[in-house]
């Protein structure tokens, strides 16, 4: 360890001995597939066949919370577990058992995202399988899909594994309201509204079911917390005096929250964790985020400090405890799904900083708790939570400096989002000004108003732009599978101008956008009808007021975005075709097409590949030639996707429509595996570019040029997130002048160029290569994959190689 790194670690301080032990214990856990929830879910579903879906789900959650294993770790100060053991991944048979059954003997043999599984668990899964055959979300979702979209599912063009196999999430609930009112307030409101229903109104029948379901889950959550209170008191009776006092304090908190309003910082943190873990027991959705934790916990922190109930160090320890507990939550995905969510991420985002409105005027929202959250994440240095800082032009300069210091630690956090772009964009979409100023990051780079936004602020169809460009050039036939995807809009070998190709692309992407909407709507309808999540809906405004679940249109706002993959490859491909084929005539259309079909293998085609790679403009270098081309092509999709309402449109929420987003997570690797050679000179099966970042080693003029290229995209329309990854060698930031330069670049990127988002991998190529060869020496090595961080050692070799290949910037 260098002296500079040790100095940096000393700056943030060390974990307390207890939290250091807890962190190590969690890191030592081997993740197992856990069958307990699946068995309990099946027991409940077998007994509730006649119940309406909302009540059936409520009774299921109630049964699970009453019967599941509960435990309190010896080092923790807050309690609540998702599975029978930390880091185990529960199974959710109501969504699907298909991939679990198919992979029972393969989980331990994976290249990445490995899970262990006992023979007992295998038997549990097999024993419940008959009940769920044809009786789950995946089966019903597939049954709703029309024949015309089956080809896209069969060929893997639409990456819908995450939607068919799991819940939605991708939201933050109203933590502020729960802490102020307790679930008692929700219970009282549901009772009052239910009592006032006119049951001669047909809509009131479903509302009554929903309200009764809310009452059921609130009571279940209260009992669940009570189980921990009872366990804590039992353990206190056998503990030493110091630990007994902690356990009794824990018991007191659990007897109160989250049913009653929180009174102290400790109770507030416990309530937040109960909500976080129970919501992930309810459904299998990821990206369940904490929202603006530094804002809604601040009153409790300040009151406790003033009253002498807590010290800064004690509050810091509770926060580190919360983050270590967050790492205990896990999710098992299908092998196919891991290609787009590599590293077993949970995407539990916490947002700090930004602005708040005071008498209608925006003010810097950085507060003492913002600093403490930043410090706590620096101390734990884990993949959870996914920390995002909201930047704005008047941000405290000292706080920005501290954010850069955390970046230097090299675990990919914090990511930075820009208020100056996101807030106006939300207001343009119809979000109330006070709500727009309260937005938080969700999951990766997606953004939403916590507690008021519907599920899934991102789509999951992953439109693969380079693969569709090849399809467009091939008369509508997919080059990978030979299957027809679209109508024949022309063949590249017969085209005589770039405008012909652009016209064919415009028709192709609009056609494919329509197909993706069909798929997403079918799955949304299946989710609405089959797996309504009552607790999550209750905690989202204004589902109780409307008597509707989120999927039925209960949220105040409801916008979703598609995800687009390979934007930079698309840009570079268009530039190569326009310049080298149609302007300079150095390559004929037939020569380029033959080279693509040959995967650039013959000597002549290797010469063509070098021309494509070296002689055509590349996105990421502030070259208007290529940057304008990708904007023109991207606009076709952005314009088209906005035409299609979601299944919630007109049912209550503001919005109910779609916009674009570039949060492709690690789908660039999986989608690349299904994409043949492309006109930018990329070989078949190689990873695509991720997010809106340039293709690997094509950005040759430093980060400022990258920033300028990225901000030429219509970011004000890409409200679903503009994901930009940058990689910097740690030695670069050891020099004070370079740290200052990075801060100046960030200010210029956000203030002058109006950048949306950026995050940094501060890690050397040498370290990553050594970690591949000697993983035992790098257990704690964390890298930024896309909009999230993951432990390098759990990633597949392909994803590791993709991260290593990224351009290493100099300042």
What are these regions (language model features)?
Residues 240:
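Acidic, metal/cofactor-coordinating or nucleic-acid-engaging core segments within structured domains
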Residues 226, 230-233, 575, 808:
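Short amphipathic alpha-helical segments enriched in leucine
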Residues 222, 229, 233-236, 244, ...:
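Heptad-repeat amphipathic alpha-helical coiled-coil interaction surface used
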Residues 2-211, 246-249, 253, 257-811:
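Conserved catalytic cores of very large enzyme subunits
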Residues 208, 212-224:
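Extended non-globular scaffold/tether segments
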């Amino acid at each position: 360890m260098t002296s500079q790194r040790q100095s940096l670690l000393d700056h943030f301080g060390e974990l307390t001995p207890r939290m250091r032990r807890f962190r190590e214990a969690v890191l030592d856990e081997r993740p197992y597939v856990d069958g307990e929830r699946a068995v309990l879910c099946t027991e409940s579903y077998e007994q509730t066949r006649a119940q309406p879906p909302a009540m059936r789900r409520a009774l299921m959650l109630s049964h699970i919370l009453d019967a599941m294993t509960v435990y309190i770790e010896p080092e923790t100060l807050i309690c609540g577990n998702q599975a029978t053991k930390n880091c185990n991944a529960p199974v959710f048979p109501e969504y699907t058992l298909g991939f679990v059954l198919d992979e029972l003997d393969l989980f331990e043999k994976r290249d990445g995202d490995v899970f262990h599984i006992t023979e007992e668990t295998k038997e549990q899964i097999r024993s419940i399988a008959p009940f769920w055959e044809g009786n789950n979300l995946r089966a019903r979702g597939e049954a709703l899909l029309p024949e015309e979209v089956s080809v896209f599912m069969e060929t893997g063009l639409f990456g819908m594994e995450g939607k068919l196999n799991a819940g939605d999430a991708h939201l933050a609930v109203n933590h502020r309201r729960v802490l102020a009112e307790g679930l008692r307030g929700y219970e009282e409101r549901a009772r009052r509204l239910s009592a006032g229903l006119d049951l001669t109104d047909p809509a009131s029948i479903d509302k009554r079911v929903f309200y009764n379901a809310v009452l059921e889950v609130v009571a279940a959550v209260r009992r669940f917390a009570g189980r921990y209170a009872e366990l804590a008191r039992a353990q206190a009776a056998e503990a030493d005096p110091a630990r007994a006092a902690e356990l009794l304090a824990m018991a007191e908190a659990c007897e109160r929250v989250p049913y009653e309003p929180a009174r102290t910082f400790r109770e507030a943190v416990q309530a937040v964790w109960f909500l976080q873990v129970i919501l992930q027991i309810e459904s299998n959705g990821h990206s369940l985020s904490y929202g603006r934790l530094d804002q809604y916990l601040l009153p409790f922190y300040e009151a406790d400090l003033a009253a002498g109930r807590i010290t800064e160090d004690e509050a810091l320890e509770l926060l580190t405890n919360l983050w270590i507990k967050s790492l205990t939550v896990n999710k098992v995905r299908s092998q196919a799904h891991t290609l787009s969510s590599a590293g077993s991420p949970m995407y539990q985002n916490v947002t700090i900083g930004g602005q708040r409105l005071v008498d209608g005027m925006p003010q810097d929202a950085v507060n003492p708790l913002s600093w403490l959250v930043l410090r706590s994440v620096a101390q734990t240095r884990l993949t959870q939570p996914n920390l995002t800082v909201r930047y704005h032009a008047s941000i405290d300069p000292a706080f920005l400096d501290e954010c850069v210091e955390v970046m230097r630690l090299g675990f990919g956090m914090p990511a930075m989002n820009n208020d100056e772009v996101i807030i106006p964009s939300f207001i343009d979409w119809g979000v109330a000004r006070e709500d727009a100023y309260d937005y938080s990051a969700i999951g990766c780079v997606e953004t939403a108003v916590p507690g008021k936004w519907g599920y899934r602020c991102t789509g999951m169809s992953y439109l693969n732009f380079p693969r569709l460009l090849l399809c467009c050039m091939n008369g509508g036939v997919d080059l990978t599978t030979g299957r027809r995807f679209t109508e024949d809009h022309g063949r590249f070998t017969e085209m005589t101008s770039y405008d012909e190709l652009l016209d064919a692309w415009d028709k192709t992407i609009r056609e494919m956008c329509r197909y993706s909407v069909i798929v997403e709507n079918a799955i949304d309808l299946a989710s609405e009808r089959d797996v309504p999540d009552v607790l999550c809906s209750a905690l989202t405004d204004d589902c109780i007021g409307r008597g509707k679940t989120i999927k039925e249109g209960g949220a105040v706002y409801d916008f979703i975005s598609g995800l687009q993959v390979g934007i930079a490859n698309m840009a570079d491909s268009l530039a190569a075709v326009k310049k080298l084929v149609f302007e300079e005539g150095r390559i004929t259309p037939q020569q380029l097409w033959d080279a693509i079909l040959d995967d650039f293998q013959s000597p002549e085609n290797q010469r063509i590949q070098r021309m494509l790679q070296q002689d055509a403009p590349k996105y990421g270098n502030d070259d208007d030639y290529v940057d304008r081309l990708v904007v023109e092509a991207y606009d076709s999709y952005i314009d088209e996707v906005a035409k299609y309402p979601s299944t919630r449109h007109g049912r209550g929420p503001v919005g109910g429509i779609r916009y674009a987003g570039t949060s492709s997570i690690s789908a660039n690797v999986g989608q690349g595996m299904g994409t043949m050679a492309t006109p930018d000179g990329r070989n078949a099966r190689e990873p695509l570019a991720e997010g809106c970042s340039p293709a690997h080693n094509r950005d040759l003029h430093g980060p400022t040029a990258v920033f300028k290229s990225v901000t030429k995209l219509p970011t004000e329309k890409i409200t679903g997130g503009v994901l930009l990854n940058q990689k910097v060698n740690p030695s670069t930031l050891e020099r004070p002048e370079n740290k200052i330069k990075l801060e100046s670049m960030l200010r210029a990127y956000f203030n002058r160029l109006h950048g949306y988002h950026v995050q940094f991998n501060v890690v050397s190529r040498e370290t990553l290569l050594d970690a591949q060869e000697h993983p035992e020496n790098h257990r704690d090595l964390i890298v930024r994959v896309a909009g999230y961080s993951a432990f390098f050692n759990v990633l597949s070799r392909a994803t590791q190689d993709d991260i290593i290949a990224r351009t290493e910037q100099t300042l």
